[in-house]
């Protein structure tokens, strides 16, 4: 079991103050989520950390069983320009990566971050892993792993709704798997 107090200091030091510890077995992995990636996301097949470049759903489910704890991070934002969301989420993903690194250096060698959205560490992604400019920083999103974010976060008491307009408040969620 992770030292919650020490890890929570790391989370807060990296600007992530809204989080909940959870049992990774509570993460809902569903086929419909991957289907939505395939037929609804412009990143499908265009990004190293997106399907079909990710493991199949059975392996994704198995991944969550190999950890004793997970942390769900909540980020809330309202932006004037819809295009600003890319810079906003890149900053969040950078923080999640820093948390993963700090957890690793604290002895949690299995720690892995899951980004809030498709990996945008370098801005313009490539579809082939051998061409990835930042392979040690690339991470999938929950949806890329088949995670039903709506169902999972609601189980923990967080709010999430389908947004109908870009001027609505966004709720984004990332994760840290830790052992």
Cite the ranges covered by each PLM segment.
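Catalytic cores of enzyme domains
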Residues: 18-47, 51-179
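TRNA-binding/sensing appendages of the translation machinery
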Residues: 1-22
